[in-house]
Amino acid sequence: MKFGLLGRTLGHSYSPAIHHALGNESYTLFEKEPDQLADFFADPSLQGLNVTIPYKIAAYEACQTLSDRAQKTGVVNTMVRRDGAWHGDNTDYLGFLYSLDYGHMEVAGKVCLILGDGASSHTLHIALEDLGAKEIIHLSRKTAPFYQDVHHFYHKAQIIINATPVGMYPKCPQALIDLAPFSLLEGVVDLIYNPLRTSLLLQARQLGLKAVNGLPFLVAQAVAASELFLESESLIKTEELIKSLQGDQENIILVGMPGVGKTTVGKALAQRTGRTFIDIDQEISKEIGAISNYIQTQGEAAFRQVESKAIQDIGKRGGLVIATGGGAVTIEDNFLPLRQNGRIYQLTQPLDKLATAG
């Protein structure tokens, strides 16, 4: 029997790791083109599938029976073969309910603004209706109201949910909208889980709002799907799995004065945690040669541009120990790329203890 995730492009999916942790070692990835779907669904060795964009509607149409949730939303993200026929369910619905609870967000009686109009956004809409949302508004690039009409809702929206891929790895950090003008905003949900903290979520936290990323959504829907696949209740708590995945993905970022010991500490941490260590200054030196010579010939401003580009590239990766250059934190634009996947630790030493050699 085969289980897995069906999609068109699945390069950075966490689903196999989640399902392996849930006891399904045969779970794998299936990348298919639209013209391959009919033959794929007919494969008798397939027992269970999760389905992601752009095939959730095709999955709905391929199922012979449907759960009440799937019928209500018109979307299938989980397929299970029962007596030779495909049964469809929508565990994204359950994942979204879990996310709201995880982020301590009340939507009853609230005005909710959804960014996006795809299959996932329709599931969110039905869930919000069921929870008693006062009004649900979709912004889209295809139909009105459009993203450029967002100003009409600055003094109305209380909960914002991003159901688009804008801000997802590798095109991060990016955001569709600026949260600052929203006067009644209480919380933000972003279904993106890579990076852990999108630009939208980081701004939400800076504004003191409730914020939750897509990891609780992803894990909760996967747990529900796994229970359908294996026909047994999961022995692993959803919250424990979320914390484990976040810990694996989150970078450890060391900042501090030159000579404070970032490289020494970073290498030790990497060895202890089994992570890859990256010294940003060393990575830059591979490209431009000795940093001191570059600053002398090109100027510090030119070097800071090179440094910021390196931070942009490295910061979007996950599971690393990263040592920054001493002056990296003096550039405000470096914060988002570092914080999106990282937890930042400042190393300190008395000035007379700082290393000056090298």
PLM-predicted stretches and their roles:
Residues 191-250:
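Adenosine-phosphate binding glycine-rich loop
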Residues 282-330, 334-339:
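ATP-dependent small-molecule kinase phosphotransfer cores
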Residues 2-103, 195-197, 201, 207-210, ...:
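Phosphate/diphosphate ligand-binding glycine-rich loop within oxidoreductases
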Residues 262:
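Conserved lysine of the Walker
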Residues 131-147, 281-288:
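NAD(P)-binding Rossmann-fold cofactor-contacting core
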Residues 145-211, 328-335:
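Rossmann-like adenosine-cofactor binding region
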Residues 338-358:
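Conserved phosphate-donor/acceptor-positioning beta-strand/loop module used by diverse small-molecule
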Residues 7, 90-93, 100, 109-133, ...:
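Glycine-rich adenosine-cofactor-binding loop
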